[in-house]
Each structure stands twice: as C-alpha cells, then as structure tokens.
Regions:
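Catalytic cores of nucleotide-sugar-dependent glycosyltransferases that transfer UDP/GDP/TDP-activated
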Residues: 1-218
Length: 218
C-alpha cells in the first residue's frame, strides 16, 4: 500500500526495509519498502516515496493519475523482481485497475505469474479516474478474473443503462464474473457494549453515551 503521511511512523519503526528500483520514462526511481505487521498479524508492505505520497491528502491531487500509475509500476516491479508470488491481487477502483491488464500481459512471459488471479472491486462507477483517454475501469472489468461490487443490488443495477455509466454493455459481457458482496462489519468485534477502544460502552438502553464518546475524541 502507498505510505501516506499517516503511515510514516509505522514505516520508520519497521524492522524490515528494502530498496526497489522502479522504471519510469527516461529514468528509474528508487523507493523504500517497509514490511510492517497489520491487523491480525498480516504483513503489509508500505511503499515510501515522499514526492508521490507525502501529501496532506490521500486523493484529490492534480497529479493523482501519475501518483497511482507510479504505484502500479512499483507493484509490477515487486511481482517480477522479488521472491513474492501472491495467490490473488485485489484491485480497488481506478487507482490500481491498470494492474489487471499488466498482470495478464506479464503472465505470457513469466510462468510464475500465470497462477495469480486478480479481483477487481468497484465501489462507485462514477469515479472513472482523471484521464478520459485511458479508461482504467474498462480495462480492469475486461481483464480481471473476478469483479465485485459493494452489494448484490448494486451489481444488478450497474448492468442497466441507468446506472451503468456507459459501461453496462461491458459489464453485461462479463456478468458471469461479477458478484456483489454486501458491505458490513464484525458485530462481535465492534460491539459498542463491549468495545474496549471507546471511552464509554453503550447499548440501546443508554444511547446517550455516544455523545460522551464524541467528546472524548475531541
């Protein structure tokens, strides 16, 4: 994942770090990757590049296209240059959509990658990315092994002209690979009656405690 400012402390504290050269037009760029422990002990690689990711905001920058193309190039280098072969690559929205085609293309010359599957998740079809000449969403819909959305109903809706945002024909073509997975949360883990991470536990009998939690956050 890109190491935005919110992840700098974790990156600096990481015990495992390595450098990787990422080819760009006209020159290569060196990035530092730190492996940290994520939720449940899952290792997470943080890609540090202050020029592209050391911003106040995660999204909404004028050069977002270049930023996330660079991130995709970094992932490609990790796949081809490092001793790392995932079973599945999960892509989200236009930011990592180009990797669906890249993975399929790389598999022709790299047998190790032929068994790597891609899952592309669409959160909102209206967000197609900043470059109208390169429709990354279309590429990912066409090349991904599986396509998921945020709910079964939304998966049905985007097959229609009304909600398909011009991609309904392509989505219909690939509807056998399309599935809606309902957004949700772990009610046991995030139960406000027992959650140790909030200042004041509450349930339906004392909902007013929520206001005290808001004050504690301030």
């Amino acid at each position: 994942t890109p190491c935005h400012r919110s992840g700098l402390a974790a990156h600096e504290a990481a015990a495992q770090r390595r450098w990787l050269m990422v080819p760009l037009p006209g020159r290569d760029r060196r990035v530092e990757i730190a492996t940290v422990e994520g939720h449940g002990g899952v290792p997470v690689d943080l890609v540090l590049d202050d020029h592209y990711f050391g911003r106040e905001r995660v999204y909404g920058e004028a050069d977002d296209l270049l930023r996330y193309q660079f991130f995709c190039r970094t992932i490609i280098q990790m796949l081809t240059q490092e001793d790392w072969t995932p079973d599945i690559i999960h892509l989200n929205d236009w930011h990592t959509a180009p990797l669906a085609f890249a993975l399929r293309n790389l598999a022709w010359s790299n047998p190790v990658l032929r068994g790597v599957a891609s899952v592309f998740t669409i959160h909102n079809l209206r967000y197609r990315g900043p470059d109208e000449l390169n429709d990354f969403l279309s590429q990912a819909i066409y090349y991904a092994d599986r396509i998921t959305t945020v709910s079964p109903s939304y998966a049905r809706e985007i097959l229609s002209k009304e909600y398909g945002e011009g991609l309904d024909d392509l989505l219909t073509l690939r509807q056998d690979r399309l599935e809606g997975i309902l957004n949700g949360l772990d009610y046991d883990l995030y139960n406000p009656r027992t959650d140790p991470h909030i200042a004041h536990q509450f349930d339906l009998s004392c909902v007013e405690e929520r206001s005290r939690n808001k004050k504690a956050l301030l």
